[in-house]
């Protein structure tokens, strides 16, 4: 059985936006959200699933002994010399079975920016020159946050960028967070 770190690395190689660790009667299902689609990754024993959740909660400074109340946490995981931010959310059901969801937040430089076709990006560049609000909508993993940060980075250093995102998903040294 691979270590928990090796398990995370195997998942990160697939570039998911999220990992879902969900309990079933006799096992835990690990599923990855990739480009807005939830794909089964692996079924593990209940014991392994609970230990994996405990390990992740420990890394994120969450209360490992709390299995019922919702909790939030975060930690950084190093993969291929890059620090990836992991944002965790756990909750238990009425049977005391715990679920955990992880959002993987990749460094902006490492994100493959292929969400838009060229004419869409050019149009956004034109809108960026004007004043007003640009609204982004779409499913999870569609590239909304990445697109906004790519646009905001182009404003530096001539303009100040203040982010109001909570929690901040992508940090940048030039932004006021």
Task: Give the positions of each predicted feature.
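Walker A (P-loop) phosphate-binding loop of P-loop NTPases
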Residues: 140-141
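Residues immediately C-terminal to the Walker A/P-loop in P-loop NTPase nucleotide-binding domains
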Residues: 154-155
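N-terminal anchoring/assembly modules that precede and organize ATP-driven motor systems
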Residues: 1-44
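Hydrophobic anchor at the beta1->P-loop junction of P-loop NTPases
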Residues: 136
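Short glycine-enriched loops at secondary-structure junctions
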Residues: 25, 167-168
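Conserved lysine of the Walker
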Residues: 144
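P-loop NTP-binding catalytic core
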Residues: 38-44, 49-50, 54-133, 158-161, ...
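Hydrophobic positions on the alpha1 helix immediately C-terminal to the Walker A/P-loop
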Residues: 147-151
């Amino acid at each position: 059985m691979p270590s928990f770190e090796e398990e995370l690395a195997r998942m990160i190689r697939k570039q998911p936006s999220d990992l879902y660790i969900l309990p079933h009667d006799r096992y835990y299902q690990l599923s990855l959200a990739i480009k807005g689609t939830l794909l089964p990754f692996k079924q593990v024993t209940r014991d392994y699933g609970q230990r994996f959740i405990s390990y992740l909660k420990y890394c994120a400074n969450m209360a490992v002994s709390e299995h019922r109340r919702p909790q939030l946490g975060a930690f950084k995981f190093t993969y291929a010399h890059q620090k990836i931010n992991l944002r965790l959310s756990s909750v238990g059901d009425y049977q005391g079975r715990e679920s955990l969801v992880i959002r993987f937040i990749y460094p902006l430089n490492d994100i493959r920016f292929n969400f838009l076709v060229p004419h869409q990006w050019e149009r956004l560049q034109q809108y960026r020159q004007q004043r007003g609000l640009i609204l982004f909508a779409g499913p999870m993993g569609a590239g909304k946050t990445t697109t906004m940060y790519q646009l905001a980075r182009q404003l530096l250093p001539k303009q100040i960028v203040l982010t109001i995102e909570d929690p901040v998903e992508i940090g940048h040294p030039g932004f006021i967070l």
